[in-house]
Amino acid sequence: QLDKIKEKPVKKNLSSDVWIKSLKVALISITNYPFGVGLNNFEIAHEKFINEISVNYPMTQKLNIQDASNNLSKIITEFGIFSLMLAYLLLRFIFSKNIDLGYKIFLLPNIFTQLLFRGAGYFNGGFIIFFIVMIYLIFEKNNK
């Protein structure tokens, strides 16, 4: 199954090629390092696994080697199975009846944009701030 992920190129443009490459690095990395490679070490996993991944454009192998192009790939690679905690917190936030819809409408697009589409790391673009506010709201609303 993992070999199919590594070898199967899909027709795409350069931007989506980079995005898919980052997800492939994350999937290969989590199978080899289930506890992750450590904070801000995506580049190490990228360097180790990039030659196992087929891409459409040679330039793809050189792009977004530090930030993974999206925070989901970066989180999975760097934190491994501990990234499931992120998924748990996100689902808890989404389905909580104690958190006002206004907070969800404000926070979720910002979090999902950086998580799935384009994110330049945890400390850029407000990702960590949005995430901290989300966690605060989860626990603050549950204590009332």
Residue ranges and their predicted role:
Residues 74-112, 140:
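Hydrophobic transmembrane alpha-helices and their immediate junctions
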Residues 9-79:
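Long extracytoplasmic/lumenal interhelical loops at the membrane interface
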Residues 68-71, 75-83, 120-128:
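Membrane-interface micro-motifs in multi-pass membrane enzymes
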